[in-house]
UniProtKB/Swiss-Prot annotation:
This is Exodeoxyribonuclease 7 large subunit. The gene is xseA. GO terms for molecular function: exodeoxyribonuclease VII activity; nucleic acid binding. HAMAP family: Exonuc_7_L. It comes from Citrifermentans bemidjiense (strain ATCC BAA-1014 / DSM 16622 / JCM 12645 / Bem) (Geobacter bemidjiensis). The keyword Nuclease applies. Pfam families: Exonuc_VII_L, tRNA_anti_2. It is an enzyme of class 3 (hydrolase). Disulfide bonds: none annotated. Its EC number is 3.1.11.6. GO terms for biological process: DNA catabolic process. It is found in: Cytoplasm.
Length: 458
């Protein structure tokens, strides 16, 4: 310091250089806490800000390399702990702190970076349920992005071998921690999408510290998951660990083993489910078949035995005829009795006038009797005509008379309604309006073929 006691004139540059040397020699590394203000990060990649407290402030600079290594984004008003060295910016004669490390006060840098990135991606909609895709129930090809030597891949293989072995596994090996791991993971996700024909993808690793899992909190991984065309299941760490990848993925699994359990169903459980469904289907088919058989039997009886229906109509005609005969007889008997009575009364009265009056009355009664008999007979004839018309309308014989026939399969004589009931060599009986014929089936056509195929004999 003797230099300053002697009268030695220094230039501004020399003095500034001297002060700079003193600062850099005595303050190689200092830790300073304060509040960020006037933050500016131009295109050069360097970051400039002021660190202040209630009594003073100091200019700071963080060069591009150090700034890029930060896990969080500094903002004005944020209280931070800064590490760096003091120097002097000679053009302005201002001393400044060249920072190489920043840490938010009250919360770790990684945690701050996690919160900031989560807020950013949430605003962009990357976590929205609208983007979530359904995980296929029975995937055939599964892609896995993880370390080839870690516990995660061993756990996944163990679960797959235990639950269902008929799946194809495509592993894309990557580093899951350290510098460059995030980029490798993102590239692997893109590569598996380019491979194609994948049904689902598992992206993950085993447990670890926040620093160990940090690659899955990087923005590059989140965006790779979001643009993936293949549904992605994130399986990072243990059940209590949450990463940005978990929020972007279509589904989060607590562990890699849990992810394998989700994508691959148990073969034993599937077999039991198929057996149960098969049994239910068999029971349902049996019930429908029984109902169909009962209906066919009832219809067959009605068609194969028309005499029952005809007999019912014949009984009705006989009943009407007997009723008509009975009522006509009653009318005649009543008239005969009245004639006898009148004849007796007439025989007791000799005057010609009385005789003439009774003759006229007798004629009137005879005429009324004729009219009554005519009306009764007309009504009876009309009833018989209606019954006969109904009988002819429903009679299979009337249908047969128009050129149709009834085919019965022998020996059961069941009525054939479809060609699917017949097979070559079957014996059938064909009934016509007059007579019947025994035939042998040479060929049976499907229902659709019968409309276009040329007629063939059976």
């Amino acid at each position: 310091m003797q230099l300053f006691k002697e009268r030695r004139v220094l230039t501004v540059s020399a003095l500034t250089a001297l002060v700079r040397g003193l600062l850099e020699e005595n303050f190689e590394q200092v830790w300073v806490e304060g509040e960020i203000s006037n933050l500016a990060c131009p295109q050069s990649g360097h970051c400039y800000f002021t660190l202040k407290d209630v009594g003073a402030q100091i200019r700071c600079v963080m060069f591009r390399g150090a700034f890029r290594s930060l896990k969080f984004t500094p903002r004005d008003g944020m209280r931070i702990l800064t590490r760096g060295r003091l120097t002097l910016f000679e053009p302005r004669g201002e001393y400044q702190l060249v920072a190489d490390y920043l840490e938010p006060q009250g919360i770790g840098g990684l945690q701050m970076a996690f919160i900031q990135l989560k807020e950013k991606l949430a605003k962009e909609g990357l976590f929205s349920e609208l983007h979530k895709r359904e995980i296929p129930k029975l995937p055939r090809r599964i892609g896995v992005v993880t370390s080839p030597t870690g516990a995660a891949i061993r756990d996944i293989l163990t679960v797959l071998n235990r639950r269902f072995t008929n799946v194809e596994l495509l592993i894309s090996p990557v580093r899951v921690q350290g510098d460059g791991a995030a980029r490798e993971i993102a590239d692997a996700i893109d590569d598996l999408n380019r491979v194609g024909n994948l049904d689902v993808m598992i992206v993950g690793r085993g447990g670890g510290s926040l620093e160990d899992l940090w690659a899955f909190n990087e923005e590059v991984v989140a965006r790779a998951i979001h643009r993936s065309k293949v549904p992605v299941i994130s399986a990072v760490g243990h059940e209590i660990d949450f990463t940005i990848a978990d929020f972007v993925a279509d589904l989060r699994a607590a562990t890699p083993s849990a992810a394998a359990e989700i994508v691959v169903a148990s073969k034993k459980e599937l077999t039991a489910e198929v057996e149960a469904l098969t049994h239910r289907l068999h029971v349902s088919q049996q019930r429908r078949l029984e109902r169909s058989r009962a209906l066919v039997t009832a219809l067959s009886r009605a068609i194969t035995d028309p005499s029952r229906f005809l007999g019912h109509l014949a009984q009705r005609v006989d009943s009407l005829d007997a009723r008509l005969t009975r009522e006509a007889g009653l009318i005649l008997d009543d008239a005969s009795e009245r004639i006898v009575t009148l004849t007796a009364r007439l025989s007791r009265q000799t005057p010609a006038l009385t005789l003439k009056r009774w003759e006229e009355r007798l004629a009137t009664l005879s005429l009324r009797l004729d009219h009554a008999m005519t009306r009764r007979l007309a009504v009876a004839a009309e009833s018989i005509g209606l019954a006969t018309g109904t009988l002819n309308a429903v009679s299979p014989l009337a249908t047969l008379s128009r050129g149709y026939s009834i085919t019965r399969k022998l020996p059961a004589r069941s009525v054939v309604t479809s060609s699917r009931q017949l097979a070559p060599g079957d014996r059938v009986e064909v009934s016509f309006a007059a007579g019947s014929a025994l035939c042998t089936v040479e060929q049976a056509h499907k229902d659709s073929d019968s409309l276009t195929a040329p007629p063939r004999s059976v």
